Regions:
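Acidic helix-start/capping segments at beta-turn-to-alpha-helix junctions
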Residues: 1, 38-41, 125-147, 177, ...
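Active-site-adjacent bridging/hinge elements
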Residues: 53-54, 160-171, 235-250, 340-341, ...
């Protein structure tokens, strides 16, 4: 490129020098960032204006008129400062971040050398040498706003990092980038300030947070965490307007944790139920009565049986009336039944015990958040996935010769064996060989057969002398094993299968295998253990594959069929924004056992409020790079495309149920709480949920043992009018959780307090325009 204009490259070489001077790195300063180029360097380190310095140096150029003594002093100071920066670029941090004495000494030395070489006039040298180099003092540090005030900013920066695939904050900071966001700045600041203030009793009292099912009189509101997320439905995307919490840490409780949000899971369960009804309608609504009657009738699928009977009787076969009829199906609220689910027997309770004897519709159960109604509803959903539609699980369970049984039993053995190995690995992973052996034998009632079974599993090549040593150590000196007896023990127990050695030792055979494997492969990872144990996991369940154990097989096959049914439920939840890669395979998922995130619940509410359409969440309206430069670029979001993920009729049915929760259900304190500019009540819908996360275990004899309260949460996921939706949550973690008994009354009251303050700000800020 230097020769594009001919052989004379002087101009190009000068430009290269200018480009270098404009980009030379000159360390960094707090409050300013990295310093590049002489212009920024003069301002950052000496407080000088670049144009003024250039003018002074031009006035001193060769051929210029002789300066006055005052002008010479100014020119000398400017020249010395520029020269010092050119020297400092060798080691900018060393020269510019220290006390400056070394830099001054080097600069004076170069002034003398340049004068001797005739590069500068002696008068300029003599004027510059006495002048001190005063590096500009650091700017007074401005107090950084706390994390509460910067929460949305931090979340947006993280989002932008992901959009640009720039994972390091350091690299993001180096971009000349402005981001235009969908956040309403005034509403965001107001919400952050209000939530932060709730840590004081006075502010909590002013918001009405003390009272039944909220904060007890005298309770300390300080440990409570509040979060609030508000979206607005736009034409192409759901726009984030407010994202705030009062955690003074970078952690974002709206998106960063898996929380027990209690009965908000009933919303997901209701949607799954109505989706199934819509699927059955799509399959059967066009059939004649004779065709409907000819459909197979499985007594294990009550939902399919109801749908068939409804369509046989219905005069109006449209989907909307069928969904309304599905909301009127009745379930018992009786907690007396035990439910076999998730591989175990479970019992559940209602929050309102006065409802225990009632039988109520799905609509009433949702409105009043009755646990047992939704446990039974989830059971019907799962059973339909197990035995209804195209499922052939019934024949699998009935026919012992079905070849699929063997395949599924092998899958069960692999799954359950892996679960045991994971547990055993955690127990032994940090133990030495001797420590693992001692831990294994600690709970073992010693006998010669048991000890021999253990030894020849963990140490297959053990000698009879080693066996004698172990028996003497564990059985005492009274044991005197003859060589013949030791040989007999070795012959008998070393030759047993892994499962039989575990049976003799009264230790799970995979635990024995793991201790032996870790002895031979110290430091093995869990992944290596699982890879190495594939055949052993099948071997220890060999008894299960024998046809005489059909009842045991059926029990485990039902567990797997249920697991597959929950996998289908999980896929439907994920399609509607459920954020996790697994779902707890238990009816308890209907009341919150599987966890959720406030942001994910808000997305589900956006789908419901948007007539079943899933719109992308938009946090950033535009990214503007290098403004007012030749490289200026502006990027705006592409239309990601909305997707119809729920039938419109399903969304409308759920929306009506949500409104009834506020009109006459668990969130009725919000009825009429918000009004528009004309004084008309704004319609609010939502679902409440209270999560009480505890850890406990049974005591001796199956009685209640120790219990630890891990956390408590109360959540309200809501819609406001036709445009706004979101979540509001109160949360407290251990060690404070045991002090509080609040329910979802707390966040609903908080929304009642916040809403009238926030909505006018949002409307004034122009939110809501299409």
């Amino acid at each position: 490129r230097a020769y594009q204009d001919g052989d004379d490259t002087l101009a190009r070489r000068r430009q290269i020098v200018v480009d270098y001077l404009d980009t030379v790195p000159l360390a960094a300063r707090p409050g300013m960032g990295e310093v590049h180029g002489l212009g920024d360097g003069l301002w950052a380190w000496y407080g000088r204006d670049f144009r003024e310095v250039n003018r002074l140096l031009a006035d001193n150029a060769e051929g210029a008129a002789a300066p006055t003594p005052e002008a010479l002093q100014r020119q000398a100071e400017a020249f010395k400062q520029v020269l010092s920066l050119m020297i400092a670029q060798r080691r900018p941090s060393q020269h510019l971040l220290g006390d400056g004495t070394g830099l001054a000494r080097l600069t004076d030395s170069y002034l003398r050398l340049m004068a001797e070489a005739g590069l500068i006039a002696p008068s300029l040298r003599d004027a510059a040498l006495p002048l001190p180099l005063h590096l500009r003092p650091e700017l007074p540090s401005t107090p950084r706003p706390d994390f509460v005030q910067r929460k949305a900013t931090v979340a947006l920066r993280t989002h932008i990092s992901a959009l640009l695939d720039v994972p390091r904050a350091y690299d993001l900071e180096r971009l000349d980038l402005e981001a235009e966001t969908s956040l309403d700045g005034e509403a965001q600041a107001l919400a952050s300030r209000l939530l932060a203030g709730l840590r004081t009793p006075a502010a909590a009292k002013a918001a009405g947070l003390f009272g039944p099912h909220m904060l007890d009189p005298g309770a300390d509101p300080g440990p409570l965490i509040y979060s609030f997320t508000l979206f607005e439905r736009g034409p192409q995307a759901n726009l984030l307007r407010v994202q705030a919490d009062n955690i003074d840490q970078p952690f974002d409780v709206n998106q960063g944790a898996r929380l027990d949000l209690g009965s908000t899971a009933k919303l997901r369960t209701l949607v799954s139920y109505l989706e199934l009804v819509a699927e059955l309608h799509a399959s059967w609504a066009g059939l004649s009565p004779a065709q409907l009657s000819a459909l197979p009738n499985n007594p294990r699928d009550p939902l399919g049986a109801w749908a068939r009977q409804y369509l046989l009787r219905a005069k109006d076969r449209r989907l909307a009336p069928m969904l309304e009829a599905a909301m009127e199906r009745k379930y018992s609220a009786n907690p007396g039944e035990s439910f076999f689910t998730g591989g175990g027997l479970h019992q559940f309770e209602n929050f309102e015990r006065s409802r225990n004897s009632e039988s109520m519709t799905v609509r009433e159960g949702f409105k009043h958040s009755i646990n047992l109604v939704f446990i039974r509803l989830m059971r019907d959903v799962v059973r339909h996935r197990m035995f209804g539609g195209a499922s052939d699980a019934e024949s699998l369970l009935k026919d012992p010769a079905d070849p699929r049984r063997r395949e599924m039993l092998e899958r069960f053995a692999d799954r359950e064996g892996s679960a045991y190995l994971i547990r055993f690995y955690r127990k032994y992973q940090r133990q030495s060989a001797a420590g693992a052996e001692a831990l294994l034998l600690r709970g073992l009632k010693p006998s010669a057969p048991r000890l021999a079974s253990v030894l020849f599993t963990i140490e297959p090549e053990a000698s009879e002398e080693r066996l004698d040593e172990l028996l003497t150590q564990r059985l005492g000196k009274g044991f005197a094993g003859s060589p013949r007896a030791l040989r007999a023990l070795r012959t008998t127990y070393a030759g047993l299968s892994l499962a039989d050695r575990g049976y003799v030792a009264r230790v799970h055979p995979l635990e024995l295998w793991l201790v032996g494997y870790l002895r031979r492969h110290p430091g093995a990872t869990l992944s290596e253990v699982l890879d190495a144990s594939a055949s052993e996991r099948q071997e220890v369940y060999a008894w299960l594959f024998k046809t005489r154990h059909k009842s045991a097989q059926d029990k485990r096959l039902r567990e797997l069929v249920e697991l597959d049914a929950f996998a289908e439920v999980h896929r439907s939840w994920q399609r509607l924004g459920y954020p996790f890669e697994s779902l707890t395979p238990s009816y308890a998922s209907a009341i919150g056992a599987s966890g959720d995130r406030p942001a994910a619940l808000a997305e589900l509410m956006g789908i419901i409020a948007g007539d079943g359409v899933r719109r992308p969440v938009q946090r950033v309206d535009a990214l503007h790079f290098a403004r007012d430069t030749p490289y200026e670029t502006r990027l705006e979001p592409r239309d990601a495309g909305a997707e119809q993920v729920l039938p419109t009729e399903v969304a409308a049915t759920v929306r009506r149920a949500l409104v009834q929760v506020v009109q006459d259900g668990t969130a009725r304190r919000l009825k009429g709480a918000l009004v528009d500019a004309n004084g008309r009540a704004i319609e609010i819908g939502g679902k409440t949920g209270t999560g009480d996360h505890r850890y406990g275990h049974n005591g001796r004899g199956g009685g209640a043992g120790a219990e630890r309260k891990i956390s408590r949460s109360a959540t309200f996921v809501f819609t406001i009018g036709d445009r706004y939706f979101g979540t509001i949550m109160a949360y407290v973690n251990e060690p404070y959780a045991a002090r509080y008994r609040f329910t979802s009354a707390l966040p609903t009251q908080l929304l009642k307090s916040l809403g009238p303050q926030l909505l006018p700000v949002l409307e004034r800020g122009g939110c809501g325009g299409d």
